Amino acid sequence: MKIAVIGATGFIGSYIRDEALARGHQVTAIVRHPEKVTVQNLRLTVVKADILKDKVDELVKGHDAVISAYGAGRSGGDVYSTHVKGARAIINGTKKSGIKRLLVVGGAGSLDVAPGVQLIDTMSPERITGGMLATRETLHMLRKEKELEWTFLSPAATIVAAERTGHYRVGKDQLLKNKEGESRISTQDYAVAMLDELENPQHIRERFTVAY
């Protein structure tokens, strides 16, 4: 499969890129800073681009699917506005390119922890970032989409670089916790879940979440 990975040098995007390559897919890494791509692979093409300035449809045209790990950063400027603009550009560009399949790296903040209560609602104001709010808005945008075969994957409350076990539990809109009350997943196993969904779609036009 030929996959365009937007944000392929990021905290999560880099693992999605590597997992896709390990499975034998052809990957186009669409990044702002090509020098950050240190992996070398004959099936990897690196393209320098700015999602807010370049035409997304031209960047992704000819691929079988788009995986967006786009992020506007954690600080500096209006992160919320920039992230939402980028997400909208990716959604519209994917549609314009004729590609149907779009998978999006989401956040945990929009997961339900109780009826009518999302994880982000339980956080103190100083912990809530523009990026968290923007990923929630991205989900709202996707849920209005009728044309794309989109999937939005929310991680557990805690996601860290650890190990690839190849195992995870799957949920829908509710935060998953283990017997100890912990909600966590490694970046590696998050990438496994993303590629599993791409190869064997189970959540078309849905959000799902993964955790141990």
Language-model segments: residues:
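Conserved beta-strand positions in the Rossmann-like core of class I SAM-dependent methyltransferases
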Residues: 4, 28, 151
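N-terminal Rossmann NAD(P)H-binding glycine-rich loop of SDR-like oxidoreductase domains
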Residues: 3-23
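NAD(P)H-binding glycine-rich loop region in Rossmannoid oxidoreductase-like domains
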Residues: 35-96, 202
